[in-house]
Amino acid sequence: MAETHWNKLGAYLKETQILGSIQNTLYWDQNTGMPKKGASWRSEQLTYIAKVLHERNSSEEFSNLIQSAKNELADIERNSDNQLFIKDKERNISLLLKEFNRERNLDPKLVESLAKAKSKGYESWQEAKEKSDFKIFLPFFEELVKLRIEEAKQISDQYSPWETLAQPFEPELTLKWLNKMFQPLKDTLPELIRGINKSKKYHWDLSLESQHNLCSQLLDEFGRDKDLVVVGKSPHPFSITLGPNDYRITTRIVEGE
């Protein structure tokens, strides 16, 4: 049986996902176990993978595969009664085209600069956090903001820079809608915060081991499968997927807090 265009697109996407999972694995290690002196080489690794991923996500080959799969789907639609299947595939095509158009507008040099700035910025942020000195991180932060604004300009002029950068996480989100949603909170939160600040401070002296055990028990209550989920510690908690059956969560615990 001849390979379909949809299958060819799937094979291409699988390779891209494998590269993305390698990128995520490096990021996980950077946050949870990498020695400080490994930061420079890690920056090179992450920058290289970001470059390769951008090339794949903006390539003519990717564009042709999407279009061929779209045409093939149109042929199937004319001869199929399974509209749910068709709608599902049409949505996939729509999202892939959106991703392709976004990537195609980006300058490869900017993609590399951003990847390098994020990696170096994370290193400086850790140092600034340890020393409680924001000035250490400030120049890296300013560089990241400048690059992000340029990224937004290259992608689209339809939204503000913030709205453009938010689209992969919150599609169609606008500042107008966001302001409307948060206005009630802006009206009520100040009084709540003042009340909290006036209340009696409660100190619960938990050892690191007790905090770790508490986090583990909570995850078990939520139904954690220990064959699928690994928990680590990082300066800032996050979750990340490294593969179809590999999910990582981090927490941050401090002695006496």
Predicted features, each with a name:
Residues 2-171:
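A well-structured
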Residues 114-256:
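Contiguous, non-catalytic segments that form substrate-binding/exosite surfaces or channel walls
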